[in-house]
């Protein structure tokens, strides 16, 4: 059997708590190090993890990865990345968490890495996509031992582990800087109407309205209402502000990587606002061909990010394209908050691919081109379609 030390992705919840003795009893490791990675969770979660680790008698590390996570979130903004219509949050956080745990494992000379993910979710794949590129063994006790929640509760009670049945509430909640997800319980039923108390970041949309100016440099958000802000602070500020107008709620049936459909409820006020502003600015500064191709890039970027393979060679190629096109995406967009929406209402940039004279109905000639010059284009437009339809009709 293996020996040595294993680094465990540790939240202090039921799954990771029971993993601690199981990694010793079932896997043969001598010691377990719990690693909790900060990607913007509430402070109470870190306190709970520290207390649980102390009660279990395991070494515990807390790693601050908020800056790295915020940078990846802004990469997602540059890519207009959404999966099945919602901003990626949990998916973006997992590779950052996995990297941080791997760094601790390497620094502490650990022989293996472990997580408490089930065999039905996406997170097992996202963690292991990072870890299996290393020389460490990977352990997944919940999946590999076929554990159920009922078994875990009974096991914890028998060994007097610091877990109380039901202490995690009716819902399964995952929070980070970019999004808050709520699932489980009755929310698993597609026809169940969730109560208002599942929401913590967003107020119910009302008639109250407001505006905010978002400034971008090379596709990256850098200021709110003219005040320069670091990424973490900018996201936190917009979460509070947009959330107060009910912006950023999603209730959906999500297709997971293993083929399961799972109902998810998300809150993502800052993400919704920044994505809307960024896309509006692109509409001002990119050509039609660039916008069309960027849509395909966005879909592929989001898919790879959802899968947790942000180090995939394709991502390097996609980011290379974005580096080129985003160089022009600098300017300011005004967003209106109204009825739970973030709606772009103004945009400006020195790189605007726009001519007010050319678009005006009151201008006859622009850059030597007159309205009448469009006649030849109009005659040819749709020409091939007319030929095809005539040929089809003639063969009936």
Swiss-Prot record:
Keyword 4Fe-4S among record annotations: no
Molecular functions per Gene Ontology: argininosuccinate synthase activity; ATP binding
Disulphide bond pairs: none
Primary location group: cytoplasm
One Pfam family named in its UniProt record: Arginosuc_synth
Pathway(s): Amino-acid biosynthesis; L-arginine biosynthesis; L-arginine from L-ornithine and carbamoyl phosphate: step 2/3
Keyword Cytoplasm set for record: yes
Top-level taxon of the source organism: Archaea
EC number: 6.3.4.5
Annotated binding of L-aspartate, by residue: 118, 122-123
Subcellular location per the Swiss-Prot or TrEMBL entry: Cytoplasm
GO CC annotations, alphabetized: cytoplasm
CDD domains reported for this sequence: ASS (cd01999)
GO BP annotation list: argininosuccinate metabolic process; L-arginine biosynthetic process; urea cycle
Catalytic activity: L-citrulline + L-aspartate + ATP = 2-(N(omega)-L-arginino)succinate + AMP + diphosphate + H(+)
Positions contributing to L-citrulline binding: 86, 122, 126, 172, 181, 254, 266
Residues reported to bind ATP: 9-17, 116
Subunit structure: Homotetramer.
Family membership: Belongs to the argininosuccinate synthase family. Type 1 subfamily.
Protein's recorded name: Argininosuccinate synthase
Source organism (scientific name): Halobacterium salinarum (strain ATCC 700922 / JCM 11081 / NRC-1) (Halobacterium halobium)
């Amino acid at each position: 059997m293996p020996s040595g030390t294993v680094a465990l992705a540790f939240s202090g919840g039921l799954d990771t708590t029971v993993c601690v003795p199981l990694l010793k009893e079932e896997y043969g490791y001598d010691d377990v190090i719990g690693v909790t990675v900060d990607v913007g969770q509430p402070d109470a979660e870190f306190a709970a993890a520290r207390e649980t680790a102390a009660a279990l008698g395991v070494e515990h590390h807390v790693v601050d990865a908020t800056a790295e996570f915020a940078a990846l979130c802004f990469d997602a903004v540059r890519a207009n990345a959404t999966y099945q219509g919602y901003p990626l949050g949990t998916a973006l956080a997992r590779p950052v968490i996995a990297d941080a745990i791997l760094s601790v494992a390497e620094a502490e000379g650990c022989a293996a890495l472990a997580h408490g993910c089930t065999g039905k979710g996406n997170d097992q794949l996202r963690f292991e996509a990072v870890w299996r590129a290393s020389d460490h063994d990977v352990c997944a006790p919940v999946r590999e031992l076929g554990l159920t929640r009922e078994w875990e509760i009974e096991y914890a009670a028998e060994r007097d582990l610091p877990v109380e049945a039901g202490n995690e509430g009716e819902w399964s909640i995952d929070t980070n800087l970019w999004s808050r997800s709520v699932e489980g319980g009755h929310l698993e039923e597609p026809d169940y109407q969730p109560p208002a108390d599942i929401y913590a970041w967003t107020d119910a949309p009302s008639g109250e309205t407001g505006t905010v100016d978002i400034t971008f440099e090379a596709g990256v958000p850098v200021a709110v209402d003219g005040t320069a802000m670091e990424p973490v602070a900018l996201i936190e500020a917009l979460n509070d502000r947009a959330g107060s107008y009910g912006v950023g709620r999603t209730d959906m049936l999500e297709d997971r990587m293993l083929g399961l459909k799972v109902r998810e409820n998300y809150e993502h006020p800052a993400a919704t606002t920044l994505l809307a502003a960024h896309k509006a600015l692109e509409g001002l500064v990119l050509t039609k061909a660039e916008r069309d191709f960027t849509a395909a890039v966005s879909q592929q970027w989001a898919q790879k990010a959802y899968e947790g393979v942000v180090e995939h060679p394709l991502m390097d190629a996609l980011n290379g394209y974005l580096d080129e096109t985003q160089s022009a995406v600098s300017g300011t967009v005004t967003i209106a908050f109204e009825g739970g929406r973030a709606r772009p209402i103004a945009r400006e940039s020195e790189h605007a691919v726009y001519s007010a004279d050319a678009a005006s109905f009151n201008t006859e000639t622009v850059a030597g081109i007159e309205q009448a010059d469009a006649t030849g284009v109009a005659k040819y437009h749709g020409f091939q379609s007319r030929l095809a339809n005539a040929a089809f009709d003639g063969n009936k």
